[in-house]
From Swiss-Prot:
A motif (Nuclear export signal) lies at residues 243-256. The modification Phosphoserine is found at S11, S316, S321, S340. The gene is DTNBP1. This is Dysbindin. It comes from Bos taurus. Residues 263-342 are annotated as: Disordered. The lineage of its organism: Eukaryota, Metazoa, Chordata, Craniata, Vertebrata. It is found in: Cytoplasm; Cytoplasmic vesicle membrane; Cytoplasmic vesicle, Secretory vesicle, Synaptic vesicle membrane; Endosome membrane.
Length: 342
């Protein structure tokens, strides 16, 4: 478009210059025709000079105006080029807008479908959220059940361990108790044997002294021994007894022959603890008239030798204890009888 405009401007300029040339030529021909041929005239140089100067001025003005028109045409051409580019941009924008406007119904349909899809997705999201909440509740319940199961297992293991410890402790206590009971029984048996041996030795010494001297009288009393098998007992019962005269040798022989029975009689007396509630223990040696029929026996507590009948013999020997009484321990007597049986 600009090229055609330039070509037109150039053609107009050429036409203008050619028209000026033709006009100058025609004016020259007209002047030549107006001259009379017959009458010769002299050339007027001043008029030609003026005409030439006028033509030069006109040509210079035309040339200047042509340059101005060319510069204006160039400016118009640049503006037209810019306008054409701007128009092309606007045309492209209009085409794009037209295409977008043509696509607008499809876009609206897509938006409607997207809206429906979003609604469906919202419902799906709500359902998934509800399922997730249910799943979270189930996970919490499972975790709680697992924790309860672990706690119950720990409780069962704790109970088992405590039961095992209790059984072990019971077994240890039973073993310790049985061992202590066995040791106590052994020590008690040893103490009882020692006491029995001690009483037998004391009895033997007293009997030897009695056989050698004929009487047994103890001037001083011994203090009670310390505790044996958790009991305080009076020792040397025979040393605390006063033996009176014997009437004849036959009664002594009968008394010596019945030593086994007296040992059985004295064995429960050696074990028990002396009790202040009893009055006395009296041992009577039989007379020759009573020797074949009556063995020596222990009188009941509270028997007074001064109250005996003098018809039985005023000289009958009597063994009387200085203690207030003797309390018989049935348990020790039983153990002593078991030892004597064995």
């Amino acid at each position: 478009m600009l090229e055609t405009l330039r070509e037109r401007l150039l053609s107009v300029q050429q036409d203008f210059t050619s028209g000026l040339k033709t006009l100058s030529d025609k004016s020259r021909e007209a002047k030549a025709k107006n001259k009379p041929r017959t009458v010769p005239c002299l050339p007027k140089y001043s008029a030609g000079l003026e005409l030439l100067s006028r033509y030069e001025d006109t040509w210079a003005a035309l040339h200047r105006r042509a340059k101005e028109c060319a510069s204006a045409g160039e400016r118009v051409d640049s503006e037209v080029v810019m306008l054409s580019a701007h128009w092309e941009k606007k045309q492209a924008s209009l085409r794009d807008l037209q295409q977008q406007l043509q696509q607008l119904p499809g876009l609206i349909a897509d938006l409607e479908s997207l809206t429906a899809s979003l609604t469906h997705l919202e419902a799906s999201f709500e359902e998934v959220e509800n399922h997730l909440l249910n799943l979270e509740d189930l996970c919490g319940q499972c975790e709680l059940e697992r924790h309860k199961h672990m706690q119950s297992q720990q409780l069962e293991n704790y109970k088992k361990n405590k039961r095992k410890e209790l059984e072990t402790f019971k077994a240890e206590l039973d073993a310790e108790h049985s061992q202590k009971v066995l040791e106590m029984e052994q020590t008690q048996q040893l103490k009882l044997k020692e006491r029995q041996k001690f009483f037998e030795e004391a009895f033997q010494q007293d009997m030897e002294q009695y056989l050698s001297t004929g009487y047994l009288q103890i001037a001083e009393r011994r203090e009670p021994m310390g505790s044996m098998s958790s009991m305080e007992v009076n020792v040397d019962m025979l040393e605390q007894m006063d033996l009176m005269d014997i009437s004849d040798q036959e009664a002594l022989d009968v008394f010596l022959n019945s030593g086994g029975e007296e040992n059985t009689l004295l064995s429960p007396i050696s074990g028990p603890e002396a009790s202040p509630g009893q009055d006395a223990v009296t041992l009577q040696v039989p007379t020759p008239s009573q020797a074949p029929a009556t063995p020596p026996s222990s009188s009941s507590p509270g028997t007074d030798p001064a109250s005996r009948d003098p018809s039985e013999g005023g000289e009958s020997p009597v063994v009387q204890s200085d203690e207030e009484g003797v309390e018989v321990d049935t348990a020790l007597a039983t153990l002593h009888s078991d030892d004597s049986d064995s």
